[in-house]
Amino acid sequence: MKSSKRKICQVLALVVSGMGASLAMAAGPVIQGGGSSLVAPTIGSVSNPASEIGLFGTSEGTFTYYSVGSGAGQNAFLNNQPTFFGAGVTGTVHFANSDAALTTAQVTAYNNTGLGTTNGPLIQIPYIVTAITVPVVNAPAVTSSTTPQTTPGQAHSIALNDDDLCGIFSGKLTNWNQVINPETKTAYTTNAAPIKVVYRSDGSGTTELLTRHLAAVCTTANTASGVKFTDSLTFANTTAFPSGVPANFVAASGSAGVRGSLASLSSAGTAAVAYLSPDYTNTFLASQSSVVTSSGALQLPIASLYNTKDTKYYAPTYANATKAIGTITAPSGAAAGDPTQWVPVSGSAYAALANPASGYPVSGTSQIILSQCYSNAAAGAAVHDFLNNHYTNASYASVVHGNGFDTVPSGFQTAISSNFLSNSSNNFLDINDSSVCGAGGFAGR
C-alpha cells in the first residue's frame, strides 16, 4: 500500500514538474497582432509548426495573430485597441499586418498627435511580396496551348487582359459570351454563361491592391457607365459605384469568406470571378498553405493575366510578382525614418507598382506595422527576434514561399536589418533603441 502511495506521489511530482517546465517555456509576454487575412496562414499560430508563429515557439513570448482584414488591423494598431481583433480581446496591440499601406495622413496623425507622442514612432515595412489572383469558377473550357499553368492538373489557363478585368469588376461584362479572349480576339463562348462577381465587403488590403491596378488601367471605354475605380480598401465604395454594385455581385467578408462563396457557387455550377491571395487558391500556387492542402480541399482554377506593357501572359506566381515590383529600392538616410517611403503611396514608384512594366500586373507588398518603442522590454525583444527570423531565417522563407509569396528583395532585407533590427545605419530607428525609447524619451506601448 505504501509502495502504491509512493508511486502515485512520484507520478504527481512528475506531472507538476512537467507543468512547471511547460509554463517556464511559455513564460514570455503575450504578443498580439492581426489584420490582413492574406498573410494569416503564413503567420499562423502556435499549433501549426509549418507557420511562422509555430516555428518561433513560445520561449520568448506567445504570439497570437487575428485574421480580421487589413482595415481592422490598421485601426487596431493606430488606436492600440484590441477590440478591433474581436469583442473579447484585451491587452496591447503589438503589431498589425496590412496589404494596404498607411496613408501619409494616417502616419502624420499618429506620430504628431496620436499614440506616437507617447508610444514612439511607428514602423511600416514590406513583409512579403504577393500577387492578387483572379479565380474563375465554372469558366469556359481552356483551349489555349500557350498560356501559363496556374492550377493543378491544368497545363494552361484562361487568360484575361485589362479590358476584361475592368469590364468584369465594374459590371460592364456580366456573361462569358461578352468576355474577349486576348489570344483569339473573340468571345470565350457563344453560349450564355452569366458571371457572379465575389468581392470583399470588409476593409481589405487585397481589395486595395486590386483597385490600385484597376484605377490605373480602367477607362470609360472598358468600364461600366458611372463606375470609376479608386485605390481603396473598400471595393463597393460610393466613388467607384455611386449607384451601388451591380445585381450580379456577391459580398463576402475576409479571404476565407470569398473562398467559401466561390466553393458554394462552384458546387451550384454557377460561373464566378473573384480576387484572392495565392494561399487561398490551390496547391500549384501555394504548395504548403494550410487552406488548400487539407484532404479534399477545393483547388480553385485561376486566370493568367496579360501585361499590356511587355505583351506577355503571366501566372500569379511569387516570382512573377517580384518581377512586377521591379527595381524599387528601399529608402536611405533621412528618408528611412519616413514610414511612407518604405511603401510608395504616390509618385513614380507608386505608378510603377499600379501598372508594372513587366511581370504579373496585379502585384505588390503586404506590410507589417509596429512600434519602435515597447514599454515591456521582453515584448520588444520578442517582436524584434520574430522579425529578424522572418527576414533572415531560411525556414521562415520556406513558409513564405510555400504560401505563394516571395520574400522582400535583398536590398530591402538589408535596409530593414540595418535600420530596424540593429542600428548599423546609425539612424536610431531600431526597435527599443535606448536613445529613443524608455529613458531616452518615449515610454512605448
Predicted regions: what they are:
Residues 1-25:
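Gram-negative bacterial Sec-dependent N-terminal signal peptides
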Residues 26-445:
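Flexible loop/hinge segments at secondary-structure junctions
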